[in-house]
Amino acid sequence: MQGQNQQQAYDRGITIFSPDGRLYQVEYAREAVKRGTASIGVRTSDGVVLAVDKRIRSPLMERSSVEKIHKADDHIGIASAGHVADARQLIDFARRQAQVNQLRYGEPVGVETLTKEITDYIQQYTQVGGARPFGVALIIGGIVNGEPRLFETDPSGTPYEWKALAVGADRGDIRDYLEEHYDEGMDLDEGVDLALAALASVNDDELSPEGIGVATVDVETETFGQLTDEEKEAHLAEADLLDTGEDADDEAEDEDATEE
């Protein structure tokens, strides 16, 4: 009983390490990230790709209200997995820091600089009583001096740089797929195809344009932009990943035949 009470104390105390060096609330925040739908980042030779799963809980929900890819600055995009409200707070913080850098130094903020400012902010919430960690992971991609950069933040406030990564649900399976198929020499279009194929690999190899979000930051223009449904559909159709709804139609026909 005493040991159980001690563990509960470490559970509730965000600023207290357990005897084996763990911060339980940070670990629980990481579990919250795993419950979110997947987000993917891919660094290519001429840009960065961000792709997210935008599955909704009800057909009555407007898909446009599900935002998982955000513009932090003209040359930086951010994808999230985990608690949407926590992500929104960090996105707002990132945008403010980008504006401050522009006003203070007269130049756009660097991707690595912005990532470190975000992770410093996140890390503060692992040391202060009366608060909790952010239950969200971010993928931050952008261009600096013609070079694509791709970073991850986690609830502990630790930054990592990647060539390709996934966060959220099925991250292990998606990362295995990326490791097997990633090529550093691929271009931006090939990076989009890889990200979509990785998402499809954990979704029965089928995706709909409305159920995903895709954004790119191009080295040539150094500009963030999101793909339209038509552009996403073209990529999915070319890769034979487009969900045509035939399975649902077949199931409906089977049900009708049974009722008859």
From Swiss-Prot:
GO BP term (any one): proteasomal protein catabolic process
Keyword Cytoplasm belongs to the record: yes
Activity regulation statement: The formation of the proteasomal ATPase PAN-20S proteasome complex, via the docking of the C-termini of PAN into the intersubunit pockets in the alpha-rings, triggers opening of the gate for substrate entry. Interconversion between the open-gate and close-gate conformations leads to a dynamic regulation of the 20S proteasome proteolysis activity.
Subcellular location field: Cytoplasm
Keyword tags: Cytoplasm, Proteasome
Known role: Component of the proteasome core, a large protease complex with broad specificity involved in protein degradation.
Name by which UniProt lists this protein: Proteasome subunit alpha 1
